[in-house]
Amino acid sequence: IARVVAIGEEAISITKIAPICLALIMLGLGLGLSAKDFTRILSAPKDFFVGFFSQLLILPIVALGVALILNLPTPIAIGLMIIAAAPGGVTSNVLTKFANGDVALSISLTAVTSLLSIISVPFIVINSANFFGVSITTNISMTGIALKMALVVTVPVIIGMIIRGLAENFISSKINIVNKITGWLFIIVFAAIWIEEKDNIFDYLAQAGLAVLILNISMMIIAFFIAKKFVSGVPQQKCIALECGLQNGTLAVFVSTLIFDEIAYFVPTAAYALIMYITGFIFIYILRKSN
C-alpha cells in the first residue's frame, strides 16, 4: 500500500533555515569557482568522468543495495537515497587537500555535480520514492523541484562566480573566510535538526547509523578501487574516493524538507554528516600512513 506524504507543520523551522543556509553555502561555492574549473575537464576528461560516473551512478546503486539488504524502514531508506543523490560538498575539497589529493579535480567534480543536481537529485529521489511505494502529494512535480532547487543552488553559484569575476583579487584573498562561514552554516542546519527533534534523534540514529556507516565506508572503498583501475594517478584516486564519501548534507536536508514533512527522512543525512567526517579523517590517516 503506497504511503502518502504531504508537507505539514512538523518541519516548519528547518524548512525556513535549510534553503537560506544552502543558498549562502552555494554562493560561497560560486565565489571559489572560475571558468577554468569547468574547462579543466577537457584537459583530463577520463579522471573527471570516472569520478562523475562513480558519484552519480554507483553511489545511488550502492545506497539502494544497503537499504534493501538491511530492510530499512521506508523513510530511512528514502533518506539514504537522498543523501546518496546529493552532490559532493565543499568539505570534500578541503579534505582532498589534507589527503594530498587532486584538489583541482575535486573542485571541478563538486562544481559540475552541484549544478547538475537540479536534474539528478529530483530524478533519483522521486524514482526512489516510487520504488519504495511512497506517493508524493506535495503538489510539486519533478520540474517544480528542479526549479526550486535552481533558485537555491544554481543561481547562487552563478552569482558567486560573477562576483568573483568582478573582484577576483579581493575574493581570492578572502576565500578562507568564506569557507569558514559556509562551515558554520552547515553546523547551523544540523544543530537545528538536533534541537527540533532532541527527544527522538537517538532513536532515529539507531535506525540509520549502521546504514549510513556501511554506505559511507563501502562507497569510499569502491570508488578508490574503481579510480585505481581507470584514473591517471594516486592523487586522483584519493580525490574521487573522498568526493564519493563526503556529500552536501545541507542540500540533502533542503530536498527532504521540500518533499517530505517527517523528520525521519532527514535522519540519514544528519547521521551521515556526523559519520562522514570521522571516516573521512580516518581514511586520510590510512592514506598518509600507507604513503
Question: Positions of the model-derived regions?
Answer:
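Alpha-helical transmembrane segments of multi-pass small-molecule/ion transporters
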Residues: 1-291
